[in-house]
C-alpha cells in the first residue's frame, strides 16, 4: 500500500476502530468492519507492515495517576542555533511530566504539553525541572480547563 493512496474505505474503517479499541480480538474487529476474520487479519498486518499503524498503546488516566491537570507551555529560547535547539529538545524528552513537545514556527519556539498535580505540582515542575534547562528566555503557560477532543491520529 502506498501512503494514503493505498487506503480504501475498509482500511480506513479498520484504522478508525483500532484507534478507539486497539485491544479488540480479530473476530470482533472483522465483524465491526464487515469482513471475515482471515481477510481482516491480512489487512491489519498489511497496514502494520506499510507503517500506517506504528504501535498499540494504553492511554492512561492522568487523574487516576495523580496528574489530573494539563498545562500548555509556550517557550522562547534565548538562542536559535542548532546546538541549542537540539539540547533543549533532548532535555524536554527526558522530563517525565512532558506528554508532547513540538518545535514550532511563530512567536514561540516550543509548544509543550505537560501533566501535573494542580498549581503546586506545576510550580514544582517549573522550578525543579523546566527552568533548570538552560536557554529559556521566556515562557507562557495556560491550564487546560477541559479536554474537548483527544485523538492520537486522524484517519482520512
Q: What are the residue ranges of the model-derived segments?
A:
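A compositional/biophysical signature of low hydrophobicity enriched in polar/charged and small residues
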Residues: 1-156
Amino acid at each position: 500500500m502506498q501512503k494514503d493512496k493505498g487506503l480504501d474505505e475498509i482500511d480506513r474503517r479498520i484504522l478508525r476502530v483500532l484507534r478507539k479499541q486497539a485491544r479488540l480480538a480479530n473476530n470482533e474487529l472483522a465483524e465491526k468492519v464487515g469482513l471475515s476474520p482471515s481477510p481482516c487479519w491480512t489487512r491489519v498486518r498489511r497496514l502494520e507492515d506499510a507503517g500506517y499503524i506504528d504501535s498499540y498503546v494504553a492511554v492512561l488516566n492522568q487523574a487516576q495517576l495523580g496528574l489530573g491537570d494539563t498545562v500548555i507551555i509556550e517557550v522562547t529560547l534565548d538562542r536559535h542555533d542548532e546546538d541549542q535547539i537540539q539540547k533543549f529538545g533532548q532535555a524536554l524528552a527526558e522530563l517525565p511530566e512532558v506528554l508532547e513537545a513540538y518545535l514550532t514556527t511563530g512567536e514561540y519556539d516550543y509548544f509543550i504539553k505537560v501533566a501535573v498535580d494542580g498549581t503546586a505540582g506545576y510550580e514544582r515542575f517549573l522550578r525543579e525541572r523546566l527552568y533548570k534547562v538552560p536557554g529559556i528566555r521566556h515562557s507562557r503557560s495556560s491550564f487546560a480547563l477541559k479536554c474537548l477532543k483527544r485523538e492520537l491520529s486522524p484517519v482520512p
